[in-house]
């Protein structure tokens, strides 16, 4: 019985797709437990890129079965499009993809609410959402009026639930200048999608439990990142679900005693999409260089990501709230050739200097930066720590020392093979 959790340790976009794909070589079951189509995972295999927003990253591994658990919110149109894209790659989803009948349904007017709210919000209040309807869907869930994927089996019941949700959102839509779609139009859109999706529905908590009882290796794949967590992130500039490791138990329907290890993913620098505080942000040529070399553009929105120096207090914070016992450090190769290299080691706050991440004062806290040695030698061919330049090796060792957590994986390039694996999470 082995279950491991892979979670983002920053503001998302840490490279979960590649690392999850790496570990699915050893996994029997890959489970996505939170979020929705706002979280795009990019897989690069043989130089070809595939972006999945809903389906777990393990779908390209023929040995792995994939689960979309009840903590997710699902846009049925996006799901069907992804299934078609995966199948077009010659990768069958038949008997390999299972979707929780308890996951909530993103309805066609949820993205409309999201977009209109963002457009109407004033500067400083705008959250910078992906406008995919995630927040409004989770609002329906919390208000106990949402429709779930299992309701696609009964169109009469679905019509009642959609009608109730539409009635609740209509005043908001009209106040924001939008026109709500008709119930008939919504049902016409959902009916053909329901025929594609209902054969995939299952009690996924029971499915996961069965796999664990049989001694199978289960990988629980997070979405977004720790600093976007609804409770532990930089509120209110956060997502609508739990993005930390503890959310895996709730979102997947497994008890905490079933989790063996927690691996946190962190870039060798920091990025953030959308609004919100970002203390180590770089606005000039260095920030643009990180964005250009690192390909830092949102896989869902295409928006340029904000870039900045590695934030060690934030990484220590993520290690604490997730209980990390391993780190996967990604995009180390992007730092190659940087004319200068700095990291944040502490913060100056009104109450003094602290090595902790000042989550409640983050908008006004000032990062304390230290210069570290840079390197110019290409590292994408390295497959062991000894093959790295001394400065790159010391950078990895610094992360271990500052967080107290071993770096198990170092990504030195975009492709699957460009990876240094020091310890397998399933070992």
Curated annotation (Swiss-Prot):
One of its GO terms (molecular function) is GTP binding. It is found in: Cytoplasm. IMP binds at residues 13-16, 38-41, 130, 144, 224, 239, 303. Pathway: Purine metabolism; AMP biosynthesis via de novo pathway; AMP from IMP: step 1/2. It catalyses: IMP + L-aspartate + GTP = N(6)-(1,2-dicarboxyethyl)-AMP + GDP + phosphate + 2 H(+). Binds 1 Mg(2+) ion per subunit. Gene3D superfamilies: Adenylosuccinate Synthetase, subunit A, domain 1, Adenylosuccinate Synthetase, subunit A, domain 2, Adenylosuccinate Synthetase, subunit A, domain 3. GO terms for cellular component: cytoplasm. One of its GO terms (biological process) is IMP metabolic process. Its cofactor is Mg(2+). SUPFAM superfamilies: P-loop containing nucleoside triphosphate hydrolases. InterPro entries: Adenylosuccin_syn_GTP-bd, Adenylosuccin_syn_Lys_AS, Adenylosuccinate_synth_dom1, Adenylosuccinate_synth_dom2, Adenylosuccinate_synth_dom3, Adenylosuccinate_synthetase, P-loop_NTPase. Substrate binds at residues 299-305. The active site is at 13 (proton acceptor), 41 (proton donor). Belongs to the adenylosuccinate synthetase family. Homodimer. PANTHER family: ADENYLOSUCCINATE SYNTHETASE. NCBIfam families: PRK01117.1 (NF002223), purA (TIGR00184). Plays an important role in the de novo pathway of purine nucleotide biosynthesis. Catalyzes the first committed step in the biosynthesis of AMP from IMP. This is Adenylosuccinate synthetase. It comes from Sorangium cellulosum (strain So ce56) (Polyangium cellulosum (strain So ce56)). The lineage of its organism: Bacteria, Pseudomonadati, Myxococcota, Polyangia, Polyangiales.
């Amino acid at each position: 019985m082995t279950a491991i959790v892979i979670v983002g340790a920053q503001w998302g976009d840490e490279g979960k797709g590649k690392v999850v794909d790496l570990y699915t070589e050893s996994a029997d079951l890959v489970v996505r437990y939170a979020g929705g189509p706002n979280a795009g995972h990019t897989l690069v295999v043989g130089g070809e890129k595939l972006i999945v927003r809903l389906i777990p990253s393990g779908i390209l591994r023929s040995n792995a079965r994939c689960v979309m658990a009840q903590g997710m919110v699902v846009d049925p149109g996006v799901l069907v499009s992804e299934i078609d894209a995966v199948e077009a790659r010659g990768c069958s989803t038949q008997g390999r993809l299972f979707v929780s009948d308890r996951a909530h349904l993103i309805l066609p007017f949820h993205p409309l609410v999201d977009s209109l709210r963002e457009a109407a919000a004033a500067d400083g209040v705008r959250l910078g959402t992906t406008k995919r309807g995630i927040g409004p869907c989770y609002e329906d869930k919390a208000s106990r009026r949402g429709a779930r994927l299992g309701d696609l089996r009964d169109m009469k019941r679905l019509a009642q639930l959609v009608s109730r949700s539409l009635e609740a959102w209509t005043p908001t839509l009209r106040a924001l200048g939008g026109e709500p779609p008709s119930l008939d139009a919504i049902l016409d859109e959902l009916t053909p999608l329901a025929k594609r999706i209902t054969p995939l529905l299952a009690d996924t908590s029971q499915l996961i439990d069965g796999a664990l009882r049989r001694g199978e290796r289960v990988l629980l794949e997070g979405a977004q990142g720790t600093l976007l967590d609804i409770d532990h992130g930089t509120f209110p500039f956060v997502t609508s679900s739990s993005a930390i490791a503890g959310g895996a138990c709730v979102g997947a329907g497994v008890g905490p005693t079933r989790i063996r290890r927690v691996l946190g993913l962190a870039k060798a620098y920091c990025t953030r999409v959308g609004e919100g505080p970002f203390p180590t942000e770089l606005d000039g040529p260095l920030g643009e260089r990180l964005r250009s070399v690192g390909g830092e553009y949102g896989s869902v929105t295409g928006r340029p990501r904000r870039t900045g120096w590695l934030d060690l207090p934030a990484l220590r914070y993520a290690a604490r709230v997730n209980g990390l016992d391993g780190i996967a450090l990604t995009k180390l190769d992007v730092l190659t050739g940087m004319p200068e290299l700095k990291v944040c080691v502490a913060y100056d706050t009104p109450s003094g200097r602290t090595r902790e991440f000042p989550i409640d004062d983050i908008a006004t806290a000032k990062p304390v930066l230290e210069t570290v040695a840079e390197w110019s030698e290409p590292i994408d061919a390295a497959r062991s720590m000894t093959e790295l330049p001394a400065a790159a090796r010391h950078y990895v060792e610094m992360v271990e020392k500052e967080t107290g957590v071993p770096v198990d994986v170092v990504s030195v390039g975009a492709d699957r093979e460009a990876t240094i694996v020091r310890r397998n999470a399933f070992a």
